[in-house]
Amino acid sequence: MDNVQNEIFYKKVIELFQNARKNLSAAVNMTMVYSYFEAGRIIVEKEQDGKERAAYGKYILKELSQRLTKKFGRGYSYDNLKLMRKFYLVYSKDSIGETAFPQSEKLPVTKEGRKFYLSWSHYLVLMRINKIEERHFYEIEAYKNRWSKDELTRQYGSSLYERLALSRNKEEVMRLATEGQMIEKPEDIFKDPYILEFTGLPELVTYSETELENKIIDNLQKFLLELGRGFTFVGRQVRLTFEEEHFRVDLVFYNRLLRCFVLFDLKIGQLKHQDIGQMQMYVNYYDRKVKLDDENSTIGIIICKDKKDAIVEMTLPKDNNQIFASKYETVLPSKEELKTLLEDKNLE
């Protein structure tokens, strides 16, 4: 009897992949994502239906792996089948609203009402994330920004969710999980810290500000990924001249979503109040001499190795929404440390 049931089980999964391969098209990867989910469902149902010992369940999966591999080739190893099982267990109980996704997106829907918007390699990364709100955030952002699997891995490794959440209130943090990062006001593009691990510079500062700037320019695409959506590079060491004096802004960008210039000044030491005053001058110049009437106010961001929040707060006006100061790190942050900071913040 067991052999008959096992044969039905094997045949059911094989037929699933046969049908999936008949639908090969530009959406082949998406088709396979749904097939992996359904395969996970069949495997879990087989486990729940029987009373087999764990060792026998392992034997069943290994036998299924051999049959699928013989039929279709690579991609159906025992470990991959376990990932399909995990995929079903995670996403059968994971619902996500469609407000962050195009309503016209015509995708299949699982029995649980779930749609999948990314490739299998993306979901392999997402399945590592235990916290559902954080997992939703990365799924939405990966879709919105068309992140590759490597870009998603980098953003998760740099703790983007925690860094954004630290500068937001509880309501805004919940919004991250349902809508992703919304760029509507100057504060929305701000991160603290900025992660510049792609520069390859050491954690201990043994380099100049010019070297830091050069490394950023050499890795401009990666810096743009760190900045987020809407940024376009304008120039480096952009000269401003008035009263026969020359000043230079380290990096100038334009954000298409906010419709404003964003100026960056790099400081490898501790932030001084004079640095904030200098950025205020740059911002005023752009607002009065460069931006068009229908564009929004210029934003200035000072990226420094260290800062004292009290100095920033006392130097800037209370209603400031144009100038920001953030630390930078040249190594990936500890996710545990950031999560602890976020938990402490939520208790305040």
Predicted regions and their residues:
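Basic, low-complexity intrinsically disordered segments
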Residues: M1-E348
